[in-house]
A protein has these predicted regions:
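Clamp-loader machinery-focused feature within the broader ASCE/P-loop NTPase space
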Residues: 1-130
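Conserved Walker B catalytic segment
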Residues: 117-118, 122-147, 154
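Conserved H-loop
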Residues: 156-158
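Short glycine-/acidic-enriched loop or helix-start segments at secondary-structure transitions
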Residues: 51, 160-161
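Conserved adenine-binding aromatic site and its adjacent loop/helix in ATP-hydrolyzing domains
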Residues: 105, 137, 164
Length: 167
């Protein structure tokens, strides 16, 4: 995750120096703060405690996500994340089809302030088949200046249809 964030920050830095991002321009500061309008996160969540049929999205957990990434400097395990979601040891998170719809919707808008619109997908191996099918086309042929960064701990568990469309 830290490398993905550094890469996105470098791509969108308006004042690169010595092969690195400046860390000072508005884009760098917003990306470092996980609050840039052209940076989107997708990560596994669970509808624990929600009413049946009520979907949950990564956006519902952004304040907690920012807190965990900040506290741990981006280095934390899936279980640490699930513990923060109060899922215990048996429940896990997933990336849903509704989340995939949200990704497509967010990326359909024009870039707000950065050179690239970026989506960091943390643990894409938790994406269900329906979600994967929904994003296949945009993953294979993303819109201009759109970047997906998949951060996987178990690439062997990625759906073959997703894996075949990545570099």
């Amino acid at each position: 995750l830290p490398l993905a964030l550094a890469y996105v920050q470098y791509l969108n830095c308006t004042n690169r120096r010595d092969g690195d991002s400046c860390g000072e321009c508005p884009n760098c500061r917003q990306i470092a703060g996980l609050a840039h309008p052209d940076l989107h996160f997708v990560f596994p969540v669970n509808k624990q405690g929600k009413k049946s049929g009520e979907a949950v999205l990564s956006d519902d957990f952004m304040p907690l996500w920012r807190q965990v990434v900040s506290e741990r400097n981006g280095y934390f395990s899936p279980q640490e994340w699930y513990d923060r979601l109060d899922l215990g040891r048996t429940l896990k998170g997933a990336i849903s089809a509704r989340e995939a719809d949200g990704i497509i919707r967010k990326l359909s808008f024009k870039s707000f302030a950065a050179k690239y619109k970026c989506v960091i997908v943390w643990l894409p191996e938790t994406m269900n088949e329906e979600a994967a099918n929904k994003i296949l086309k945009i993953l294979e042929e993303p819109w201009e200046k759109t970047l997906f960064v998949l951060v996987s701990e178990r690439p062997d568990l990625l759906l073959p249809t997703i894996l075949s469309r990545t570099q």
